[in-house]
């Protein structure tokens, strides 16, 4: 979650699951901030947009990529089960294809769309003055291998491209907020990007060599990168996602 506040109002980036709304509102108030005026969803998944209905009813203006509204407005099937359409009040009311800029609290906040990556509706949020970048689930920082939701139009090659885009925007003082894990640096993101390139390269080469999924998993191409092996997405699960990119079922 990212929060920016000041005389122009409070901006919240992502809102987790609905039951957490009171805790989020309390944390915002503890910062001395006014109630959330603007809410940006980095993508449609429920752990980032589940509080939309609550914040929408409380008067927040919700913004997201065009495809976030499309997916939230219709029933979706994911690797973790079916997700029912959200009520109207939970849907983004301002949507965009390429991104937008907010001029609030003395900041230019750039909301940047990226090509299909974690999903087909990912956004990066860049506070240019504060030198802070929120990447949503384009970046999983060490607590798990990344989740590439191919059922939502995701593509691991897009995750690498998004990392490259953010690396070009960042410097050594930039604070990078991942979708999961601790706040990171440009060096952390570079290591993540290099890990993805290495794993994807190994898996793609193995697919071209005719190896089966089980043979590729036995190669352990995702091991040795310092990622929590028992996280939300395990090494084997991530290899399956990458394998499916190059050899769809």
What do these predicted regions represent?
Residues 7-11, 19-63:
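Active-site metal-binding motif and surrounding structural segment of the metallo-beta-lactamase
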